[in-house]
């Protein structure tokens, strides 16, 4: 997989399509000739707000698109191996709260010696009362134990975590409860949608 500007442009085009499509919901309702309904106005404002947020996110993460080493140097460490149709997850444990310019998790695709940033991600212990991004869609990740090499063992409590991964022997890193996830496919086109948890276009990289 060769990183190219065309992939970035295509991803941004699909992001814009997703944003415009979301903003078009309810646009057919009119309160009178030539007058948009309140629903249309609200959708338009939401679309504009999302475009602005995504622009901030892209500006902040462009340095990581093909530079995993920089991400590591800036505190992102591996927390999963390749999750099919998703990617390798790298987390910066020092990033707290929601700031679109500072995603705590970067999701990479890998082939050969090349790494491509596909998505950025946030996790929550419960679904946010107010979506942090307009139109946000959520996924889920079950409770489990993470190990230093990115391997993962499902476990309902930290006490149930083996001290080392049963298969790789890697040392225990951390445990987390059931989580609500928010993916944003900012750097790789995703026909399933900007906020989809998985991406069929990265299936080719499921085996690294």
Language-model features: where?
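Bacterial N-terminal signal peptides that target proteins for export
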Residues: 2-11
